[in-house]
């Protein structure tokens, strides 16, 4: 599973006071978000526009929007979606890009810079394979001169999110969680299950192990949820809950009640 992902890869369009997620976490509150819905017909390549983003911005249930460009990176979509959200809301925009293993370090570094230049709050880099790749990924945020929010930098205005979806990375979760300049660390439970040969129980165990490390060092941890399990996920301690599709609003309403919001 991909993080469609607790505090985390979000894009912020101004200072920290304008970043809704970063308003909530210091208060110990859970943030709720939604995958940016494609405006294309079902089965067609995704389409994201400023008009579509403006419509999403009208929904008061969402604290953040997760723009998933892992499958096909589109800088035009980043800019358009950011503009649409910014016009009428303070919602945080999180953009997920393809993994380093797909397009290489230089391309990934350039994308992080491009996304922040477009005004986004944060970037999510998925499929971090090990500790060394996690260190490499965080240098991209340094190169972009992003003022990254972290427990050590509570006045930061940008979010750096990494996703662990492979067994080796899960095994190195403690060391990765302790890296400087990290905002959100999440486990891609679906992808991890695939890497484990379909072992859903093993993937859930990995998810809980990553969660425990984020709670230990006070990072954000994001996870998708449904109406059936959102209350449990909040009790477990996830602080960024992601919904998708027509059932997202129902899930968030249940989650907000459970979280005291």
Each language-model region and where it sits:
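Positively charged n-region of N-terminal signal peptides that target proteins for export
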Residues: 1-4
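Expand to "…catalyze enediolate/carbanion chemistry for C-C bond making/breaking, isomerization
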Residues: 17-261
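Bacterial N-terminal signal peptides
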Residues: 6-15
């Amino acid at each position: 599973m991909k993080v469609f992902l607790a505090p985390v890869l979000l894009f912020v369009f101004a200072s920290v006071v304008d970043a809704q997620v970063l308003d909530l976490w210091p208060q110990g509150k859970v943030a709720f978000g939604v995958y940016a819905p494609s405006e294309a017909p079902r089965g067609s390549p995704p389409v994201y526009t400023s008009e579509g983003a403006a419509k999403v911005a009208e929904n008061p249930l969402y604290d953040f929007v997760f723009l998933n460009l892992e499958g096909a990176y589109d800088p035009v979509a980043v800019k358009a979606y950011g503009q649409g959200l910014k016009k009428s809301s303070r919602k945080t925009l999180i953009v997920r890009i393809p993994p380093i293993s797909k397009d290489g370090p230089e391309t990934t570094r350039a994308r992080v810079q491009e996304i922040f230049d477009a005004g986004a709050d944060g970037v999510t880099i998925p499929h971090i394979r090990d500790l060394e790749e996690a260190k490499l990924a965080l240098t991209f945020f340094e190169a972009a001169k992003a003022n990254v929010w972290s427990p050590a930098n509570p006045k930061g205005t940008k979010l750096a999110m990494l996703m662990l979806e492979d067994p080796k990375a899960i095994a190195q979760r403690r060391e990765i969680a302790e890296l400087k300049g990290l905002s959100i660390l999440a486990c891609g439970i679906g992808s991890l299950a695939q890497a484990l040969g379909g072992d859903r129980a093993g993937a859930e165990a990995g998810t809980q192990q990553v969660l425990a490390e984020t709670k230990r060092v006070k990072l954000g941890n994001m996870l998708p949820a449904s109406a059936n399990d959102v209350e449990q996920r909040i009790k477990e301690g996830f602080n960024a809950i992601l919904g998708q599709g027509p059932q997202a609003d129902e899930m968030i309403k249940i989650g907000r009640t459970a979280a005291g919001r």
